[in-house]
């Protein structure tokens, strides 16, 4: 039996790039909560003792950017310089301007356009992917890496492992078999966890706690065997972390945000962008389309691409591939997708309820993946049952 190895990584919410994603989306939440028509393109960067937010925002909302930055950093656990950043004493820089009027008139017609007429906020192409290898219809490598990162944060915040600090990375290698285009996970080959820790803990304690409190509750026992390799803090020391260890920037973890290297990616990041930015809304609707194809039993694996031109409402192209796993011809799958999903930006915002912010709606997406999450706010995970015409 021919097998292959595939690897996906994740980082948890204390990683500097992910801190930036969460700040950008916390600002988006604040804008949309007060003004659902807000136009937001918010970037964040961070380094030792400093967080800067910058970009273009046009909104009627009253937003205290500095408070949002400090609250978000504090919520992650950055409460002292020792752990990588002090939320209450770091410098916060803000350089926010309004959206270019050239873009505004081309996309929104200065808000005179009906929802179905609203053009894409930029050109670009986005991909959605789904696979039947997990209940989430997501790749197992990505699911495990992401859940290990989330569990690291959980046992840090609930004090199960009080030696943990906010920054951390995970990586999972799975051995697969290709079953005529469908992916069959056989076993977990390697688990890698690198987590920030305090000065007092020993490497033996780190390894013991990670196996017992992080890996054991997350990775199903049937995937582990005597040959599974564990690299637990292989560098030996990870005390300095967060923005003190590395600079961070919004939009630098786009593979972690999506499918862990499976499928494809058009290159556009998600966080800090309102739904007129098709980098985000387009990627959400093609995930819903691909997931619906697999959940409806039309294929075991599916990828969907959509593309846009700035200022144009209708997509330029829609593509689907079922990797030879389809139960009906590919052209029929494409027809069903076009009949059941409206790819115009204004309609995606309505159909997926994307103009609703606040209550951490978008901030939640900015750590532990945008897809495969069991949360009613992740409206794009709702399956539409697709019935082929007899």
UniProtKB/Swiss-Prot annotation:
This is S-adenosylmethionine synthase 2. It catalyses: L-methionine + ATP + H2O = S-adenosyl-L-methionine + phosphate + diphosphate. Its cofactor is Mn(2+); Mg(2+); Co(2+); K(+). K(+) binds at residue 43. It comes from the Eukaryota. The keyword Lyase does not apply. Homotetramer. Its EC number is 2.5.1.6. ATP binds at residues 15, 167-169, 235-238, 246, 252-253, 269, 273, 277.
């Amino acid at each position: 039996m021919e097998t292959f190895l595939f690897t996906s990584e994740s980082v948890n919410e204390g990683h500097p790039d992910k801190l930036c994603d969460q700040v950008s989306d916390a600002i988006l939440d604040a804008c949309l909560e007060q003004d659902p028509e807000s136009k937001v393109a918010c970037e964040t960067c961070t380094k030792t003792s400093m967080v800067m937010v910058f970009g273009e925002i046009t909104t009627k909302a009253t937003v205290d950017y500095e408070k949002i930055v400090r609250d978000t950093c504090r919520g992650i656990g950055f409460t002292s310089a020792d752990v990588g950043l002090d939320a209450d004493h770091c410098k916060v820089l803000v350089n926010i301007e309004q959206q270019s009027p050239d873009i505004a008139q081309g996309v929104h017609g200065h808000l005179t356009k009906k929802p179905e007429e609203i053009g894409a906020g930029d050109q670009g192409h986005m991909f959605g992917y789904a696979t039947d290898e997990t209940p989430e219809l997501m790749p197992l490598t990505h699911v495990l890496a992401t859940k290990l990162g989330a569990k690291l944060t959980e046992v840090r915040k609930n004090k199960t492992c009080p030696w943990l600090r906010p920054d951390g990375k995970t990586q999972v290698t799975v051995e697969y078999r290709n079953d005529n285009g469908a992916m069959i996970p056989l076993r977990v080959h390697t688990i890698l966890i690198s987590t920030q820790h305090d000065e007092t803990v020993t490497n033996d304690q780190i390894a013991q706690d990670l196996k017992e409190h992080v890996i054991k509750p997350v990775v199903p026992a049937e995937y582990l065997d005597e040959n599974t390799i564990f690299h637990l803090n292989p560098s030996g020391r990870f005390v300095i972390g967060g923005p003190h260890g590395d600079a961070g920037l919004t939009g630098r973890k786009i593979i972690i945000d999506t499918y862990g290297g499976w499928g494809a990616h058009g290159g556009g990041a998600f966080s800090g962008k309102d739904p007129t930015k098709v980098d985000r809304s387009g990627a959400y609707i093609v995930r819903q389309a691909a997931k619906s194809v697999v959940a409806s039993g039309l294929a075991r694996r599916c990828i969907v691409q959509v593309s846009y031109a700035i200022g144009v409402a209708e997509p330029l192209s829609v593509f689907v591939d079922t990797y030879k796993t389809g139960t009906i011809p590919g052209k029929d799958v494409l027809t069903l997708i076009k009949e059941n999903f409206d790819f115009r930006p204004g309609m995606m915002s309505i159909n997926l309820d994307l103009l609703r912010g606040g209550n951490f709606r978008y901030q939640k997406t900015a750590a532990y993946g945008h897809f495969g999450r069991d949360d009613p706010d992740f409206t794009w995970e709702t399956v539409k049952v697709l019935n082929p015409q007899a």
